[in-house]
């Protein structure tokens, strides 16, 4: 139903907004999909969220919109508040983990908060939607001396792969990138003039001058030992000259940790955690750390303020 013929418009007139605020039962799923795309555009342009975060929002909200569409197709007129309660029950029936359900609820709340803030809705139907309580596991992280032991296992070797590994460990520990972000880097993402990694247009993570020198040498020399095709833009290459995969680097990190005699499970995520803990210990504000880590929600960053034992 499109009573005033404006469903396909990207820009909503005040007349259309007023109509839809008072007739939410008749807002079609097509209109909501336009709102959905406007929300993702807002997250991209105004919030500067990473592609990984945007993909999570898209997946979560696609599921939510599909559920509402299916319920509306049954012809039973009900409020969005009731629909969202039913959606939450559906998530529980699917036996998602508490953490996954909490993330999907948080995505839904963010979307409807945007709907109200942008004038598309008068009231937020997700405002009182209960959020599952996620129990926080102890965060595993490396002390500086443990990190040096890990790094030493790569540095002591002279192969092109080991030189690459040492640079990857240094960069991960110094920037807290996600492993997916690390292996997705191209040479153009390293800005040696400003000493930073450019993840996307809105997110840049700085590093020290010392690491800039290491990266510069790697780009000019060590990387070329693994380069077979000059058109290849990947920063970190495998022995075949192709982009190193996240699974590959996960196994590499595990191997170095074992040889270093580090007890417990050490993964690239452990280095990301170590970066975050170190930043907070050095006085970095929580919202600044959120930007550095590329977290969509401050609650994801807040876990690093909780006491956490070291590995082992």
Located regions from the model:
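Charged/polar low-complexity intrinsically disordered segments
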Residues: 7-11, 21
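Conserved catalytic core of the tyrosine transesterase superfamily
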Residues: 16-312
């Amino acid at each position: 139903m499109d009573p005033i013929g404006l469903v396909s418009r990207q820009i909503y007139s005040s007349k259309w907004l007023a109509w839809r605020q008072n007739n939410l039962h008749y807002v079609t799923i097509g209109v909501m999909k336009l709102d959905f795309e406007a929300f993702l555009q807002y997250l991209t342009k105004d919030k500067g969220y990473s592609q990984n975060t945007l993909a999570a929002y898209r997946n979560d909200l696609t599921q939510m919109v599909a559920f509402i569409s299916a319920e509306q197709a049954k012809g039973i007129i009900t409020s969005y508040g009731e629909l969202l309660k039913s959606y939450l029950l559906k998530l529980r029936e699917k036996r998602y983990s508490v953490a996954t359900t909490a993330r999907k609820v948080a995505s839904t709340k963010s979307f409807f908060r945007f709907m109200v803030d942008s004038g598309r809705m008068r009231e937020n139907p997700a405002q009182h939607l209960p959020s599952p309580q996620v129990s926080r596991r102890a965060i595993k992280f490396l002390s500086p001396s443990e990190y040096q032991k890990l790094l030493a296992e790569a540095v002591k070797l002279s192969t092109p792969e080991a030189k690459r590994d040492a640079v990857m460990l240094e960069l991960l520990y110094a920037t807290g990138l996600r492993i997916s972000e690390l292996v997705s880097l191209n040479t153009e993402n390293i800005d040696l003039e400003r000493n930073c990694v450019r993840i996307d247009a809105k997110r840049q993570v700085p590093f020290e001058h010392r690491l800039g020198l290491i990266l510069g040498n790697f780009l000019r020399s060590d990387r070329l030992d693994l380069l077979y095709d000059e058109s290849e833009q990947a920063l970190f290459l495998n022995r075949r000259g192709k982009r190193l995969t996240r699974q590959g680097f996960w196994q590499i990190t595990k191997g170095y940790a074992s040889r270093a005699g580090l007890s417990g499970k050490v993964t690239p995520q452990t280095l990301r955690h170590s970066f975050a803990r170190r930043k907070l210990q050095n006085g970095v504000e929580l919202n600044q750390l959120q930007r550095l880590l590329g977290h969509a929600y401050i609650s994801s960053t807040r876990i690093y303020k909780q006491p956490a034992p070291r590995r082992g």
